[in-house]
């Protein structure tokens, strides 16, 4: 029965497997982005620029919080994918159970801590006083729903670890539609304001999590856990945390950098906040292809590493790099020439000052998309191989680069100077990633030759 729903990526044509897995991942990422985008569209159209700025200014903070949980879940799922690739299903189920313990614990602790620090964090980000009430209320509701976020991330990660990228997509589509309906209901009909967007997001994510759980129960007997699977093993916790924490920190370190940039943008006022927010949301949609390729490689590399098929790892990485470069060129053209028109989704055409801010961002960063795409490839490839520290180090390089640019230009030069923080960060992140990947593959090749000799 398991063969009907799982996807063994250790056999078959690598390119075909990667593309078939990547497409649902990409669509899933689009709908994941749609949660916050739907909030921004409804808020911007019905509540005005200040509401759009309030929600938009939380983007980097939400990425910090949800990125940490997503990184943890993705790290835990790598061990699940490796044991699945090795056909050691009892060990796989054990690590699923231990992952559930850890994800729940982290979500609960984060909820308590972030609720207590809600306002101090927003003040550190230079959130304008006139928006403080709206932003604080919005994030407070998001924090209260972190257990739901952790549940969905974990369940979806388990499905992807076993090669199923389609089912999480279907659940996201359903919940995204519900999210839009609830946004309109809470804001337009009931008049709940910005907080209505947050309630809609949490409820929609809860629906995704429930759908995932029901689907696993009905269609994935290989993931049915028994009492013995839940026997606590601190050794297993250590193995999971060795991958989960670096991946969570990598997301969070990257998010800290974007929070620093957001704080710099906030200095320029609500017009720049709104324009930067719209540009960021559009860019997030466009680069979901990069994110999908990266997540695909984590599963592909993890399964093949577990099966000991390192030749397939190298082959898959090489072909994926080519596909990423092709999409980078397409993305550069789209953002440079058509980015302005895409902002109309969030901003009224008459608000030319806000639109010009978005266009300035696009024209400043578009040339660096090949570097951004490569980050996802090498970061996730190394993580799939079981190396968590170097990808985290790449995040540190990102943070240093962003911080340095902001330190020297924020409030001292034009907005375009702040925008350069992103390309600088993308290039810096690759400094440890590519050399270490080359080192790992050469080390494996030498070991193979020595064994053959």
Map each language-model feature to its residues.
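Hydrophobic transmembrane alpha-helices of multi-pass small-molecule transporters
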Residues: 64-67, 111, 179-184, 209-213, ...
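Hydrophobic/aromatic residues within transmembrane alpha-helices of membrane transport systems
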Residues: 27, 39-43, 55, 80, ...
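Small-residue-rich hydrophobic transmembrane alpha-helices
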Residues: 52-112, 149-168, 276-339, 372-394
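Helix-terminus/linker motif at the lipid-water interface of multi-pass membrane proteins
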Residues: 30, 34-53, 122-129, 185-192, ...
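Short alpha-helical transmembrane segments in multi-pass integral membrane proteins
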Residues: 1-22, 80-145, 189-245, 301-368, ...
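Short runs within selected transmembrane alpha-helices of multi-pass transporters and secretion channels
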Residues: 73, 142-160, 168-176, 197-210, ...
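N-terminal transmembrane alpha-helices
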Residues: 9-46, 60-75, 79, 104-111, ...
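Transmembrane helical elements of multi-pass membrane transporters/channels
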Residues: 20-39, 141, 175, 204-208, ...
């Amino acid at each position: 029965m398991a063969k009907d729903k799982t996807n063994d990526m250790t056999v078959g044509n690598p390119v075909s497997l990667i593309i078939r897995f990547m497409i649902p991942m990409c669509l899933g990422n689009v709908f994941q982005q749609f949660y916050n985008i739907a909030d921004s569209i409804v808020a911007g159209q019905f509540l005005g620029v200040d509401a759009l700025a309030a929600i938009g200014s939380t983007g980097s903070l939400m990425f910090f919080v949800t990125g940490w949980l997503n990184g943890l879940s993705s790290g835990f799922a790598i061990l699940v994918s490796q044991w699945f690739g090795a056909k050691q299903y009892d060990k796989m189920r054990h690590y699923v159970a231990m992952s559930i313990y850890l994800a729940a614990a982290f979500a609960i602790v984060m909820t308590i801590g972030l609720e207590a620090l809600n306002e101090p964090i927003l003040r550190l980000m230079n959130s304008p006083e006139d928006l403080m009430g709206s932003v604080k209320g919005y994030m407070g509701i998001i924090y209260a729903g972190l257990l739901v976020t952790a549940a969905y991330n974990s369940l979806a990660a388990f499905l992807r670890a076993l090669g199923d990228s389609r089912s999480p997509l279907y659940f996201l589509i359903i919940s995204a539609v519900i999210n839009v309906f609830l946004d309109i209901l809470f804001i337009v009909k009931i008049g709940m304001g910005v907080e209505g967007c947050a309630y809609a997001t949490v409820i929609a994510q809860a629906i995704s999590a429930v759908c995932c759980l029901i689907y696993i129960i009905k269609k994935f007997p290989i993931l049915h856990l028994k009492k013995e699977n839940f026997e606590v093993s601190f050794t297993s916790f250590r193995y999971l945390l060795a991958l989960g924490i670096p991946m969570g920190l990598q997301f969070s370190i990257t998010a800290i950098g974007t929070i620093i940039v957001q704080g710099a943008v906030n200095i320029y006022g609500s017009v720049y906040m709104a324009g930067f927010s719209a540009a960021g949301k559009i860019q997030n949609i466009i680069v979901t292809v990069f994110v999908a390729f990266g997540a695909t490689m984590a599963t592909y590399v993890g399964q093949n590493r577990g099966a000991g098929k390192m030749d397939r790892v190298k082959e898959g990485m090489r072909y994926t790099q080519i596909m990423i470069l092709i999409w980078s060129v397409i993305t550069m053209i789209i953002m440079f020439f058509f980015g302005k028109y895409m902002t109309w989704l969030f901003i009224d055409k008459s608000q030319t000052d806000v639109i010009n801010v978005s266009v300035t961002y696009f024209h400043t960063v578009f040339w660096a998309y090949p570097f951004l795409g490569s980050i996802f490839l090498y970061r996730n490839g190394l993580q799939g191989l079981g190396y968590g520290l170097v990808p985290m180090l790449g995040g540190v390089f990102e943070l240093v680069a962003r911080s340095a640019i902001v330190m020297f230009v924020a409030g001292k030069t034009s907005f375009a100077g702040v925008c350069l923080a992103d390309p600088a960060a993308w290039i810096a992140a690759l400094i440890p990633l590519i050399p270490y990947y080359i080192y790992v593959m050469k080390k494996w090749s030498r070991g193979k030759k020595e064994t053959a000799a």
